[in-house]
Amino acid sequence: MVLLLLAGLLLPGQKEQPELQGKIFPAITNHLKIISTDGKSIDTIHEKAQKELAKVIAEQYQLGKELSIILVCTGNSRRSMMGAAMGNASAAYHGFSDLRFYSGGTTPSAFNSRSIRALKEIGFKIEPTGGKTKPGPKGEDNPFYQVSWLIDKGWNCIEFSKHYSDPKNPQKDFIALMVCDEADSACTVVMGAKKRIPVPFADPKAFDGKPEEAAKYSERRDDIGRFMLSTLAIAKEQLKSK
């Protein structure tokens, strides 16, 4: 039987952890607590995806074996980037030590500075490494960034805009979350994915350069974060019944 603690997982043969949650940067933990208790629910259009994702996580999660999820959108610039970051922080918050989130696109561009700002606003540490890869389709500079959410550096990652099939991402047996309608329509088959789940979120790009720009990026970050937190909470309850 899999036993669950409020702040994390306790699996057979595993001692009660210095909880993974305790390694998250405090500002991120505080923000996750706020959006998980603010009384807001996920959108109705996401409920089916939530049930589907929670079910597959509960069925396939195993301690010591990574379960990989790639968030896919067109440009791998905004929603997929923020979604992977919020997914990884949410996994740590709920104690899923072997659940990892990645990002990718169908037409990669660059990690948008507004997405970076929205994540840094709640405590993520995002710093350029000095390296970069090939530019986006419009000639955008595409630097590498170190993205950190945990004190333990081994859990953090290097992010850059890339095709979902980039060698830096899992190549097979991953779950694909299609977080934009365009990618969902253009990429009906995600090569290597064992499960493909559409869960579209509105693109904050529509507000670039407008007075509400920062607020809309923060809103989308929190919408995706709330989806991740509540989905993993459901998966924990389903694991509990095994």
How should each PLM-predicted stretch be described?
Residues 4-5, 98:
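N-terminal low-hydrophobic presequence detector
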Residues 5-18:
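Bacterial Sec-dependent signal peptides at the C-terminal "C-region" and cleavage site
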Residues 16-242:
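Short polar/charged helix/loop
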